[in-house]
Amino acid sequence: MGSVPTVIPGIVHCWMIHCLIGPFLFAIIYWSIFIEGMFFPQKYLDCQSVINLLCGSNQQKRIFKEKLRIYQVHIQEKIGCSKFNTLLLIYQLGSRHKINRQINDLLCNLCSKNYMIMLLYAEIIIYSSFSCVLSATIFLRGFLL
């Protein structure tokens, strides 16, 4: 059993890693995905609202709906985040009058950003695992010495 001077630093280090570093790393993901929505909340629209906002013929809307449906399935399979697709979709559209020219570029851009977000998730998981192991080691060292 460790003495008080060695146990307390172990507990403090454990608390610092879990309560300060861990949440900070997780916040990176939420900041990178949702920062636009914090400053521009009108971008948070459901997919039907996006379609209703688009200018163009019914055929253009049908094509867009189908591509949007395919993209939603892709994003949900890869990331599992239902809000992320709409935010990036509206962010990339820019102008609702240019949907015909932008839709293919939009889907390509979104797919490439998709992999960037997946890398962020992997990085956060690695840092979190390292944080848990490090904090457990520090805590046990302080507790057992």
From Swiss-Prot:
Primary location recorded for the protein, binned into one broad class: membrane
Membrane topology according to the record: Multi-pass membrane protein
GO cellular component, one term: membrane
Keyword list, A-Z: Membrane, Transmembrane, Transmembrane helix
Localization (cell): Membrane
Regions crossing the membrane: 20-40, 116-136
Misc. comment: Partially overlaps IMP1.
Protein's UniProt name: Putative uncharacterized protein YIM2
Species whose genome carries this gene: Saccharomyces cerevisiae (strain ATCC 204508 / S288c) (Baker's yeast)
Gene name of the encoded protein: YIM2
